[in-house]
Amino acid sequence: MKKVAIIGALLMLAGCAEVENYHNVVKTPAPAGLEGYWQTNGPQRSLVSPEAIGSLVITHAGDTLDCRQWQRVIALPGKLTMLSGELTNVTVNRDLYAIEREGSTLEYDGMTLQRVTRPTAECAAALEKSPLPTPLP
């Protein structure tokens, strides 16, 4: 029992956050210039293969789609929120990913994403199949 308490305290001190219920997360509108389509360019250490592509779609209202593709497409809707003063994407699976923007580059889940004009065909198909609640950029 003491080990559980110690581990819990360490997680709190480390700044780890957890979301109990996705639907209770307060959605934050996208800051100016963040709305749009973002995509990896070239190999990324945090993706499973050099051929894998990571994409993030962000609407003005703060709805998101985290779309990763390699041999299949995994597309998770989410929403932007502020956690401990940091802009964070919370997916429906309750995964938390901090978002840092510098010019036309985003740092997201260990990936570097560049602004693009539209999503990949596979991510566009995922958006058609399961549209986000607010209009796309």
Predicted regions located by residue number:
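C-terminal motif of bacterial Sec signal peptides marking the signal peptidase cleavage site
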Residues: 12-15
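Bacterial signal peptide processing site
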Residues: 17-20
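An anionic, turn-rich surface loop/hairpin at beta-sheet edges
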Residues: 79-99
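C-terminal partner/receptor-binding element of secreted or periplasmic proteins
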Residues: 108-137
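N-terminal glycine/threonine-rich, aromatic-flanked beta-hairpin/loop signature
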Residues: 40-85
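Positively charged n-region of N-terminal signal peptides that target proteins for export
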Residues: 1-4
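Secondary-structure transition/turn motif
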Residues: 68-73, 91-96, 108-117
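N-terminal helix-cap/turn-to-beta initiation motif at the start of protein domains
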Residues: 22-39
